[in-house]
Amino acid sequence: MNSSDGMLIVNVSAIQAVAIAAVTYYFGAWLRKKVPLLEKYSVPSPVLGGMLVALVLSCLEYFRLMQINFDTSLQTLLMLAFFTTIGLSASLKIVTEGGKLLVSFLFVITILCVLQNFLGMGLAEMMGLDFHYGLLAGSVSMMGGLGTSAAFGPYFEQTYGVQGGTAVAITAATFGMVVALLIGAPFAEWLIRKYKVLTPKEVDNPEPELHIPEDLETAVVEGEKEPTYTPQLLKAGTIVAICMGLGAVLSQYMGQYITLPAYIGSMIVAAIVRNVGDFSGKYMVEGKGMNAIAEISLVLFVTMAINGLKLHELLNLALPLMIILAGQTILMVVFAWVMFFIFGKTYDAVMLCAGGIGFSMGSTANGLANMQAIAEKYGSSPRAWLIISLVGAFLIDLINALLVTWMGAW
């Protein structure tokens, strides 16, 4: 803790940042229960708690009273762990079940990716800006999120001489992340009510449950009534750690040829590990332990990311950038509404819209958080969950990186 120009500067360690995120999440969950309107519109708990924390901290920093610096090393670790579990869910056997819907959704999202870039580039040039700023405020930040923004920002600065490219991309990604979290679940809720979509709980009224396969063994401690999942957690944690370690090596190698988010290497290794297990039958990588790691890392990663948002930086955006971001928001809402009709006005379509808004203006974690908020109220959609995970966290990142690299060279 020190001071600079009269402003108190507090450095929060990595473990303290995790602790704050956990408390923030439960505060958001408590607030959601206490305010019926928040429950009605399925606003995610990490958003409620995290946005309040971010707002307070941003005000303190804006008025030069206090600046909080979070150590994000464990946030990065949690992000890698979460996306590694996504890779471990990428079973080719399951993907084939996604079939035409998976391919169709990927095609539609690729179109959105192109539209985001054309909109950003067009508006930037109309206002006399270098079109690269439009790309940075297009699919780099919108579809790519903070990770892709942090990767391509310096790349654009060094390759095309775009001054402040990293700041523009990260600020746009921050804006997109906030908007995606605020409108994703409420938009899905509106679709369900407006078009009277039949939900899983209306069909078979299942008990609330986590996204956990039921055909798994659990270890029971002798003398205890409740099962413990220590062996499964240990096995899952070991597999995730190995995939992350090997993935870091792969990411470093791939980084010599193409700019990709840090988690891509871990996801590729995880997908290989999963499918080797599926086809060889030698081991199984799914289970309650893997599900627990995925959910815990998702909640903490998203909450930590929101806690660290510099909301006051949005006030410093130039008018042209604000216009581009407003245009991207309108495009996303209209496109999501069109997607709902394209995919048949079903509950799966609703969930694809909620998840699509999340990762098309922020990150896959945001999309899954939006979907989880809806699933808690109306029931899960396993197929939509899988498709959003595969397309948002893996397939579209590869396509987006290639697309941005190509369009940036125009």
Describe the predicted segments one by one.
Residues 1-18, 189-237, 278-283:
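Intrinsically disordered, low-complexity non-transmembrane regions of multi-pass membrane transporters
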Residues 9-23, 69-83, 132-139, 257-269, ...:
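Structural signature of hydrophobic alpha-helical transmembrane segments
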Residues 24, 51-59, 72-99, 268-277, ...:
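Hydrophobic transmembrane alpha-helices of secondary-active transporters
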Residues 31-47, 64, 68, 194, ...:
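Flexible hinge motifs at transmembrane-helix junctions and intramembrane kinks/re-entrant loops
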Residues 122-129, 173-217, 338-347, 392-410:
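Juxtamembrane and boundary regions of transmembrane helices in multi-pass small-molecule transporters
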Residues 123-168, 175, 187, 205-207, ...:
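Alpha-helical membrane segments and immediately flanking helix-loop junctions
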